[in-house]
A protein has these predicted regions:
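Sec/Tat signal peptide C-region and signal peptidase I cleavage site
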Residues: 21-25
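Structural motif
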Residues: 276-296, 301-306, 331-338
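Solenoid-repeat scaffolds in large eukaryotic assemblies
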Residues: 306-310, 325
């Protein structure tokens, strides 16, 4: 009898382990739910996670998870995990868009969306939504924007989950792996866009045995210092726009010397201007700055479709009509600012280049340096900044015209990942090339391929066939054409009267 006790003890221990595993798998109960933009029911659930990983019994946060079930009855065991951008974007709020982008993949695979901690409904770190007028004021006045961020930081730190040190990418990827385990998936496919590519790379680094395939679009590697590269990459994309306009006959005729026009416009700043609010119809007077002018152009560079309007908008601004350019301020993504700065201030800001001369702290660099000065910084392991070789296929997509994550970042990452990685550039597209139909098909074949060799051999030829949209000239109303002949219109060769600034810019409401 005594000789059999160890076997019984081992059996009891084994059952205990199985019970523990079952308990873990059951820790994410799912229920049917309806989400905006989805054609079918989804499955929603909440996973409890410790705010501080070192204190598993301490403050807990709710991690919100959505599973969009595969349509087929006999689904495949490797779901797709999607990582949103920002940092600070909610993946769940993008459910309809992501379901559309992955519709063919969703036939036989579940799609898993997680509101990363700090985003969406997962311990949200959102600042108060400013009015359109206040947003404009912050864009025109950096100190006002920094003061608003400081106020937001103080308010966020009063929340039960307000220790801003615990929202880094490595901690978020530990959350992701807990979701994978709770769902009972052994290996998963990763799809990441923009900041989601950094998250995907960190998951691959930390949990390589649980990754089957990975596709990342608009690559932002962990060692990329966003505040340092942001303005440089945007300027390169704008220079490409000027070159393409000069090379296209119709654009060159409509907008001769576009690059010089832009430089002259920048040189004229700061400049008092006026704009008409499209909602109220009232004229307001503001001072346009170089920094604000550059920020207005940037959204138009993300998409070549929007970029097709930029030559016209720049020429109109140079003529004193800022309405078209100001319209770009309305395009952007909804992010949780607290999560955004918790990530950037911990992972990027400590590695920023020092300010070393006039203008070196303009634009994004100056904003992040000031905002991060008082922002709590989480610990980031040195291994986070490394990119080990990958044992699984990785597809890296880039837009040749991308103003924030151009191909140079993806090419460097692909080299580090090794022979299992493949970098593909869509030369005539900007940020997020997965939105292009033929690239969605290519991604489907990459993920769906039966073998790694087949995945690496998927035809990506359509990337070279995507054209750049032609420059677009919107029809002008009669009153705008008459204004072009007004002798009192904006002239950057002489100062404007503060009593009667020139007609111009409309606000984004």
């Amino acid at each position: 009898m005594s000789r059999r006790l160890p076997w019984r003890a081992a059996l009891v221990a084994a059952f205990a382990l199985l019970a523990g595993a079952a308990s873990q798998a059951a820790s994410l109960p799912l229920h049917a739910c309806r989400l905006a933009g989805l054609e079918h029911d989804a499955q929603c659930g909440v996973l409890k996670r410790p705010l501080d990983p070192a204190k598993p019994d301490g403050t807990q946060i709710d991690l919100h998870v959505v599973v969009i079930p595969a349509l087929a009855r006999q689904k495949l065991p490797d779901p797709i995990f999607f990582f949103a951008g920002g940092p600070g974007q909610s993946a769940i709020e993008l459910a309809g868009t992501i379901e559309h982008l992955t519709s063919r993949l969703g036939a036989r695979r579940d799609l898993v969306l997680i509101d990363q901690r700090g985003t969406g409904h997962s311990a949200p770190l959102k600042c108060d939504e400013p009015t359109a007028e206040e947003s404009l004021a912050r864009m025109l006045d950096r100190q006002r924007a920094i003061a608003a961020l400081d106020e937001c930081r103080v308010a966020l730190q009063k929340l039960p989950w307000g220790d801003l040190r615990f929202y880094t990418t490595p901690i978020a990827m530990a959350d992701t792996d807990a979701v994978r385990e709770a769902l009972g998936a052994d290996r998963i496919n990763l799809l990441g866009i923009s900041y989601g590519t950094r998250a995907s790379l960190e998951y691959l680094r930390a949990y390589p045995t649980h990754v089957r395939r990975m596709m990342i679009d608009g690559v932002a590697p962990p060692d990329m210092v966003l505040p340092d590269t942001d303005d440089v990459d945007a300027d390169s994309a704008l220079a490409a726009l000027f070159r393409d306009c000069a090379a296209e006959k119709a654009c060159a005729q409509a907008h001769p010397a576009l690059a010089q026009t832009w430089q002259g416009l920048l040189a004229a700043m700061p400049q008092p201007i006026a704009f008409v609010g499209p909602v109220t119809g009232e004229t307001r007077h503001v001072t346009m700055t170089r920094e604000a002018l550059r920020s207005l152009v940037r959204p138009g560079l993300y998409s070549p479709t929007l970029g097709a309007l930029l030559p016209y908008a720049i020429d109109q601004a140079a003529a004193g009509h800022f309405e078209p350019l100001m319209a770009f301020a309305a395009s952007g993504i909804d992010i949780a600012e607290g999560e955004h700065f918790s990530v950037i201030c911990a992972e990027d800001a400590p590695r920023m280049a020092p300010a070393n001369g006039p203008g070196s702290d303009e634009g994004a660099r100056g904003l992040y340096r000031a905002a991060c000065a008082n922002w709590p910084r989480g610990d980031v392991p040195s291994a986070f900044y490394t990119i080990p070789r990958s044992a699984v296929p990785v597809l890296l997509l880039s837009g040749g015209l991308d103003p924030v994550t151009p191909p140079r970042h993806a090419e460097r990452v692909a080299k580090a990942l090794g022979p299992m990685a493949r970098s593909v550039v869509v030369a005539n597209n900007g940020h997020n090339v997965t939105a292009i139909a033929c690239m969605r098909d290519a991604v489907f074949h990459f993920i769906n391929a039966a073998s790694d060799a087949e995945a690496q051999a998927v035809d990506m030829g359509c990337a070279a066939r995507v054209p750049r949209p032609l420059a677009f000239e919107p029809p002008l109303p009669a009153r705008a054409r008459a204004a072009d002949n007004d002798p009192n219109r904006f002239d950057d060769s002489a100062p404007n009267s503060p009593d009667a600034p020139p007609p111009g810019m409309k606000d984004a409401r």
